[in-house]
C-alpha cells in the first residue's frame, strides 16, 4: 500500500474517534437528523476500524514469530507462523485498500430499470425483452423484487420499451454499470436465409431517490395527462382514466405509470420516477465530466456509449469498457448468471478509484 493510501486510512481512523465523541454529545443526541447522519457515517467506518485492529494483531503475531525464529527448537513452528501472518497481512492490505474506495450512498438502494429497443426493428424489441428477462432473473437470484411500472410490447415479442422498479438491498451497487447501449449479433427467428443480423437496445439504471434527497420541481413545469390503462388491474382500469403520464417541460423527461388501480397511486409512482430521473440527470452530467477528465470507461454513466456486444454465433459476450473482458458463457449469462461479469466491472471500477486516490494528496 502506498504512503498516500496509508495516510488516508489513518485519517479515517481519526474521524471514527471524532464521531464516537460527537455521538456522546447531548446536543447531537437531541438532534435526530444530525444524530442519524453521524451514526450512518460511523457505521460505514466500522469495517475500516475492524480491519486496522486485525492488521495490528497480525503484525504483532509476525513480530512474535520472528523473535522465535532464533530458537532452534522453535524455528520450524516460527516459520509456519511467519508465513501465515504474512499471508494474512497481504489479505488485509487488499481489504483495507478496497475499503478506501468512496462508498456510493445509493449502493444499498432500489433502482428503476429501463430497457428500450434501438435499431433493428422487431429483432431489437425481442432483444430488449431478452435483456429485461436477464436482469429479472438475476434479480430473482439475489432475492430482489421486480415491479413493472410501464411497458410497450413489441409486435412479435419482447418490448419496444419496459420500465420496472427493482427492490432489494444492494440492487443499485450490482447493476449500476449496466447503463448504455447493448448490441446483439444473431440469426433472428424470423430470418429464413440464416443471415446474422445486428440490432441494439439501450439500458438505463436510475437509482431511486431517497426520501431525504431534495430537488425542487415547480408544479407549473409539469404537464399531466391521464389515459386508460392497459396494465394490471383487470377491467376496472380500462373503464377509468387511471393511468398517468407526467412531462417535465423544461427537461423533456416523460414518465408514466399504469400499474395501479387508482389515478392517485399511479401519480405518486410517476412522481417518484420523475424525481429519480431529474436527480440522476444532474449526477450523470457530473459523472460524465469527471469520466472525461479521468478518461474512465466503467462508471461514466453515458447511456449513448456502446458498452457490450452479445455474439450468439460464438457464444461470446464482450464488454468494450474493459480491455480483454470477453466471456464465452453467453447462454448462462443471458439467463441471468451475471455474477462473473458484474464482478469484473466492480473490480475495474475499484482499481480506477484506487489509482485516483493514490494520485491525490
Curated annotation (Swiss-Prot):
GO cellular component, one term: cytoplasm
Subcellular location per the Swiss-Prot or TrEMBL entry: Cytoplasm
Biological function: Peptide chain release factor 1 directs the termination of translation in response to the peptide chain termination codons UAG and UAA.
Database matches in NCBIfam families: prfA, PRK00591.1
Protein family per UniProt: Belongs to the prokaryotic/mitochondrial release factor family.
Alphabetic keyword roster: Cytoplasm, Methylation, Protein biosynthesis
PTM comment text: Methylated by PrmC. Methylation increases the termination efficiency of RF1.
SMART domains named among the record's database cross-references: PCRF (SM00937)
Residues bearing PTM N5-methylglutamine: 235
The organism of origin for this protein: Xanthomonas euvesicatoria pv. vesicatoria (strain 85-10) (Xanthomonas campestris pv. vesicatoria)
Source organism superkingdom: Bacteria
Name of the gene encoding the protein in the UniProt record: prfA
Annotated coiled-coil segments of the chain: none
GO MF annotations, alphabetized: translation release factor activity, codon specific
Listed name of the protein: Peptide chain release factor 1
Amino acid at each position: 500500500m502506498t504512503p498516500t493510501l496509508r495516510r488516508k486510512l489513518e485519517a479515517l481512523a481519526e474521524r471514527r474517534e471524532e464521531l464516537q465523541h460527537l455521538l456522546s454529545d447531548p446536543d447531537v443526541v437531541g438532534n435526530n437528523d444530525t444524530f442519524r447522519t453521524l451514526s450512518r457515517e460511523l457505521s460505514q467506518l466500522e469495517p475500516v476500524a475492524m480491519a486496522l485492529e486485525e492488521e495490528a494483531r497480525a503484525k504483532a503475531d509476525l513480530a512474535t514469530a520472528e523473535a522465535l525464529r532464533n530458537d532452534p527448537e522453535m524455528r520450524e513452528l516460527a516459520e509456519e507462523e511467519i508465513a501465515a501472518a504474512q499471508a494474512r497481512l497481504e489479505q488485509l492490505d487488499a481489504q483495507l485498500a478496497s475499503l478506501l474506495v468512496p462508498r456510493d450512498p445509493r449502493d444499498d438502494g432500489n433502482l428503476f430499470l429501463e430497457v428500450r429497443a434501438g435499431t433493428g426493428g422487431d429483432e431489437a424489441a425481442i432483444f430488449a425483452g431478452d435483456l429485461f428477462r436477464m436482469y429479472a432473473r438475476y434479480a430473482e437470484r439475489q432475492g430482489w423484487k421486480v415491479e413493472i411500472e410501464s411497458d410497450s410490447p413489441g409486435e412479435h415479442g419482447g418490448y419496444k420499451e419496459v420500465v420496472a422498479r427493482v427492490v432489494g438491498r444492494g440492487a443499485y451497487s450490482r447493476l449500476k454499470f449496466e447503463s448504455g447501449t447493448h448490441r446483439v449479433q444473431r440469426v433472428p427467428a424470423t430470418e429464413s436465409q440464416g443471415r446474422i443480423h445486428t440490432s441494439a437496445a439501450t439500458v438505463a439504471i436510475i437509482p431511486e431517490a431517497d426520501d431525504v434527497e431534495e430537488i425542487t420541481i415547480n408544479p407549473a413545469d409539469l404537464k399531466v395527462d391521464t389515459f386508460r390503462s392497459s396494465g394490471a388491474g383487470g377491467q376496472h382500469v380500462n373503464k377509468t382514466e387511471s393511468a398517468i403520464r407526467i412531462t417535465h417541460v423544461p427537461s423533456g423527461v416523460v414518465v408514466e405509470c399504469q400499474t395501479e388501480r387508482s389515478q392517485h397511486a399511479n401519480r405518486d409512482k410517476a412522481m417518484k420516477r420523475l424525481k429519480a430521473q431529474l436527480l440522476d440527470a444532474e449526477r450523470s452530467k457530473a459523472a460524465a465530466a469527471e469520466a472525461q477528465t479521468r478518461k474512465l470507461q466503467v462508471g461514466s454513466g453515458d447511456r449513448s456509449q456502446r458498452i457490450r456486444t452479445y455474439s450468439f454465433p460464438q457464444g461470446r459476450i464482450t464488454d468494450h469498457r474493459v480491455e480483454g473482458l470477453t466471456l464465452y458463457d453467453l447462454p448462462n449469462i443471458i439467463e441471468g448468471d451475471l455474477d462473473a461479469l458484474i464482478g469484473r466491472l466492480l473490480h475495474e471500477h475499484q482499481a480506477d478509484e484506487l489509482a485516483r486516490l493514490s494520485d491525490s494528496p
